[in-house]
C-alpha cells in the first residue's frame, strides 16, 4: 500500500539521517510510489534545506549534531510526534520571529519548518538550533547553563535573554496539557523558560501528543486560556479535548494512520 505524503517525507528523512545517501529507485519500491513522486518529495526537501539532489538520489544536508539530537530511531519510534510537528510547521505562515521551546515534539516541528531568509527563530534548545543552523534562517540561541540530558539552555541567564526579544508566535511542547491545570512541565527550569517565552509572544501554539492531554506535571507554566492553538493527535481523550476547546483553545488534530488533519485552518500572522 502506498504511503501518504506526510509520512513519506518522514521516511526519506529517516533514511538520509541513517545512511547519508538515498536512491530514488529503492525508495520508490519500498514506499510503493512512482520514482517521479519520490523526485518531487526530494525536491521539496531540498528547497527546505534538508537534502542535496544527486544523480539518481540525494545526500544529506545535515550536520553531525543532527545525528545526536534527532536520530533515525527517534523518528521511527515517534510517529505521532512526527505528524504533529509537520502539521504545525504547515500552519505557520507570515511570522517574522518565532520562539521555539524545548522538547522532542518541537524538535519535530523544527525539522519541517520551511526556510525563509526573513524569519528569525529564537530557541533555548540546542537540538533545535542544530536542526536549523544550516538552513536559510536567522537562528538565535539563548545563553545560560546547558542541561545535558536534553541539550537546552536554562537558568536565569536564559530567562533574561528571552526578554530581549518579542515574537509573533511561540511554539512550545509540554509535559502535561489539561483544562484543569493548564500547561505543566517536569522541572522548574524548563517551566521558567516557557513562561518567559509566553510573556514575550503574541500568539501561542502548543504541540502535544495525545498522552499529554489530561496529564499534569509538577511545574506550572500557564493556564490553558493562554493557549491559542493546540496541535495533537487522534489518541487524545475526547472528553479532555472538549474541555480544552470549551476554554477557548482551537484544537487541530492529526490522524496518525494517514496523516490527514481534522482541522485545516492555517495560522496567518499579520
Task: Describe these PLM feature segments.
Residues 1-104, 110-122, 126, 132-137, ...:
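HTH-adjacent hinge/linker in prokaryotic transcriptional regulators
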Amino acid at each position: 500500500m502506498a504511503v501518504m505524503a506526510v509520512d513519506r517525507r518522514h521516511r526519506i528523512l529517516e533514511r538520509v539521517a541513517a545512511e547519508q545517501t538515498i536512491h530514488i529507485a529503492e525508495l520508490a519500491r519500498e514506499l510503493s510510489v512512482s520514482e517521479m513522486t519520490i523526485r518531487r518529495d526530494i525536491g521539496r526537501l531540498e528547497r527546505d534545506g534538508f537534502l542535496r539532489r544527486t544523480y539518481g538520489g540525494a545526500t544529506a544536508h545535515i550536520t553531525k549534531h543532527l545525528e545526536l539530537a534527532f536520530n533515525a530511531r527517534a523518528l521511527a519510534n515517534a510517529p505521532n510526534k512526527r505528524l504533529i510537528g509537520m502539521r504545525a510547521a504547515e500552519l505557520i505562515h507570515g511570522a517574522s520571529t518565532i520562539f521555539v521551546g524545548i522538547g522532542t515534539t518541537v524538535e519535530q516541528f523544527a525539522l519541517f519548518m520551511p526556510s525563509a531568509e526573513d524569519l528569525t527563530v529564537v530557541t533555548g534548545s540546542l537540538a533545535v538550533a542544530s536542526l536549523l543552523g544550516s538552513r536559510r534562517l536567522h537562528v538565535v540561541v539563548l545563553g545560560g547553563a546547558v542541561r545535558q540530558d536534553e541539550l537546552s539552555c536554562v537558568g536565569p541567564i536564559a530567562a533574561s535573554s528571552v526578554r530581549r526579544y518579542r515574537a509573533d508566535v511561540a511554539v512550545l511542547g509540554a509535559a502535561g496539557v489539561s483544562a484543569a491545570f493548564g500547561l505543566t512541565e517536569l522541572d522548574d527550569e524548563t517551566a521558567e523558560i516557557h513562561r518567559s517565552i509566553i510573556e514575550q509572544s503574541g500568539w501561542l501554539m502548543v504541540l502535544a501528543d495525545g498522552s499529554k492531554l489530561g496529564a499534569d506535571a509538577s511545574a506550572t507554566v500557564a493556564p490553558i486560556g493562554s493557549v491559542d492553538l493546540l496541535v495533537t493527535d487522534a489518541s487524545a481523550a475526547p472528553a479532555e479535548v472538549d474541555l480544552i476547546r470549551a476554554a477557548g483553545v482551537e484544537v487541530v488534530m492529526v490522524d496518525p494512520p494517514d496523516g490527514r488533519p481534522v482541522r485545516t485552518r492555517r495560522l496567518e500572522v499579520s
